[in-house]
Amino acid sequence: MGLYLCIFDEDGEDICGVEVGLYNYFEEFRCLISKYTNKGLASKILKRKSRFTLPMTTLLNHSDCDGSWNVDECVQLKMELQEIKQVFMNELPDLSIIELKQDIFKFYGIKPENLFECFIDSDCEFRIDRLLELCDLAIQENRSMMFQ
């Protein structure tokens, strides 16, 4: 079963949505971001600094199985995603992610050149870009982003 993030209009019609992919793909995306924030015990012991200036709490602290991000949270989420994109575009691809998704990458002929390109949605579009577009629409339409 996969995660679908979407925006509904006032009549409950789906305006736009993103098939994020399997729940475990979204979870590994968030786990990697968490590693880059260096909030784990090992990072504290080794005194590693976060590669992000933002704490990434909007993305990391929300359950992925239910609920929504309201418009204010979408504004914050957009800032987080912009920073994630900037950092990930300058990082090497993660071999464990490539291995996890090797069938998808092979099918679509994708060879990620950086960490940003390791994350695609079910339509083979870059996940972070699609989430940024969804944030923009939620803000523009003054609608929450729903987890389905």
Residue map of PLM features:
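Acidic (Asp/Glu-rich) sequence patches and key acidic residues
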Residues: M1-E133, L137-Q148
